Amino acid sequence: MNTQDQPVTASLVAEAQRLDFLPTYFGPRLMMRGEALVYAWLRRLCERYNGAYWHYYTLSDGGFYLAPDLAERLEIEVDGNGFRGELSADAAGIVATLFALGQLAAEIAGTDAADALIDRYHFLRGFAAGHPEAAAIYRAID
């Protein structure tokens, strides 16, 4: 039997489900830290970022990400790898979420919660491969 892999899709979290999103994906103990890390990473990566409303997305493979509600493209600069480029707010949110997941998993290494975050990191990284800005996302997180 020939089965094709289904592409991973993202779904915007409805307003009524937003309260459940952070504890579901970061865990109840880490939800505040995880959310704050995503915002902090975008501030670190984008000098001109000065806050925004953030959308929450779930992925059909169990992953997730956050992305700011901004129309303009963001100039992203990653000191650690020399990446500099413009990304859409959606792609910048993916990058910020990946960095936040990596940092948070490292902070709690050796725990079941860290293992769950690592899985979610890989789910999101896999989703990014099909994103229209995949090449720039991968260069940013390299």
UniProtKB/Swiss-Prot annotation:
Belongs to the antirestriction protein family. It holds the Pfam family Antirestrict. The lineage of its organism: Bacteria, Pseudomonadati, Pseudomonadota, Gammaproteobacteria, Enterobacterales. Keywords: Plasmid. The keyword Cytoplasm does not apply. This is Antirestriction protein KlcA. Transmembrane segments: none annotated. It comes from the Bacteria. Could be involved in overcoming restriction barriers during establishment after conjugative transfer.
